[in-house]
Amino acid sequence: MSADAAAGAPLPRLCCLEKGPNGYGFHLHGEKGKLGQYIRLVEPGSPAEKAGLLAGDRLVEVNGENVEKETHQQVVSRIRAALNAVRLLVVDPETDEQLQKLGVQVREELLRAQETPGQAEPAAAAEAQGAGNENEPREADKSHPEQRKLRPRLCTMKKGPSGYGFNLHSDKSKPGQFIRSVDPDSPAEASGLRAQDRIVEVNGVCMEGKQHGDVVSAIRAGGDETKLLVVDRETDEFFKKCKVTPSQEHLNGPLPEPFTNGEIQKENSREALAEAASESPRPTLVRSASSDTSEELNSQDSPPKQDSTAPSSTSSSDPILDFNISLAMAKERAHQKRSSKRAPQMDWSKKNELFSNL
């Protein structure tokens, strides 16, 4: 085929994995009637997931060696022989189908061939951005292929004899409903649905914050046909950084922009100021509260202030402060003061009633 056709073809993915404490974190299997080995399951948080490996990917090369015609055990032996790191060239079902139609052989050199002519593109893309051509988001997407991929996907499928052909599940560590697996040759696979996709909308209705049963009911309510707006892991992270919920407007329209470091710092500074504002008044509030209290006490005492200043008689009535009276008189007044503070005597005629109530 021509070089131009190859240049426009979708590309495989090169996933570089470093073995963790529990291995690489993916399951390999072969399918009946299909040649090759496939990724069946990718464990969350594993080196395989971090490297971008997806369930349903077909394994083409291991450390630069083609394994398309090798048996399951031969491929496993190659991976184990790599010790603590391995390089896997894979293709997802959609890319695999398109490359087969174009007659392109999947190999690692295909990625290098695409990188070489594109080295001058970043500078041209920077100039285009500097020119401020904001009215052509699709052109900006073309100069940023990684951003062009970070779009939601609308998967339209009609129910087959065995249903749609996918399993739905929820993850305790992550909010939302996810595609656990997609059956080969199913309506779900034909629509482009992939394992680990997160469902955003069902038949145009947003499923954010919905429970598992709600999503299942919405799918069943569509009858024999359903439309699922989904995002893969990378796209989901991109929209979360932008603080935007994906929608059908993002299928072809302009994409949101993630917060830059400056904006994040501004947000952090605003949060810090807000925290400082919420925390700093606390001591001042204590002081103002005490001053308010003292003012209230003074205002209450201000009318009696005249009493407290005028009646030196009240101060002279204090047995301790009055030095003009005799000691016996002072003792008598002190005794009267103590007796006036005593609790009233109990009516013992009611003691039985009181105790019985207790």
Swiss-Prot record:
Residues 14-94, 154-234 form the PDZ domain. Residues 287-306 have a biased composition (Polar residues). CDD domains: PDZ_NHERF-like. Signal peptide: none annotated. The modification Phosphothreonine is found at T293. The modification N-acetylserine is found at S2. Residues 135-149, 348-358 have a biased composition (Basic and acidic residues). It is a peripheral membrane protein. Pfam families: EBP50_C, PDZ. One of its GO terms (cellular component) is endomembrane system. The keyword Lipid biosynthesis does not apply. Keywords: Acetylation, Cell membrane, Cell projection, Cytoplasm, Membrane, Phosphoprotein, Repeat, Wnt signaling pathway. The modification Phosphoserine is found at S2, S46, S162, S269, S280, S290, S291, S294, S299, S302. It is found in: Cytoplasm; Apical cell membrane; Endomembrane system; Cell projection, Filopodium. Residues 114-134, 307-319 have a biased composition (Low complexity). It comes from the Eukaryota. GO terms for molecular function: chloride channel regulator activity; protein-membrane adaptor activity; signaling receptor binding. Homodimer, and heterodimer with NHERF2. Binds the N-termini of EZR, RDX and MSN. Binds the C-termini of PDGFRA, PDGFRB, ADRB2, NOS2 and CFTR. Binds ARHGAP17, EPI64, RACK1, OPRK1, GNAQ, CTNNB1 and PLCB3. Binds PDZK1. Interacts with CLCN3. Binds the C-terminus of PAG1. In resting T-cells, part of a PAG1-NHERF1-MSN complex which is disrupted upon TCR activation. Forms a complex with CFTR and SLC4A7. Forms a complex with SLC4A7 and ATP6V1B1. Interacts with TRPC4 (via the PDZ-binding domain). Directly interacts with HTR4. Scaffold protein that connects plasma membrane proteins with members of the ezrin/moesin/radixin family and thereby helps to link them to the actin cytoskeleton and to regulate their surface expression. Necessary for recycling of internalized ADRB2. Was first known to play a role in the regulation of the activity and subcellular location of SLC9A3. Necessary for cAMP-mediated phosphorylation and inhibition of SLC9A3. Involved in sperm capacitation. May participate in the regulation of the chloride and bicarbonate homeostasis in spermatozoa. May enhance Wnt signaling. This is Na(+)/H(+) exchange regulatory cofactor NHE-RF1. It comes from Macaca fascicularis (Crab-eating macaque).
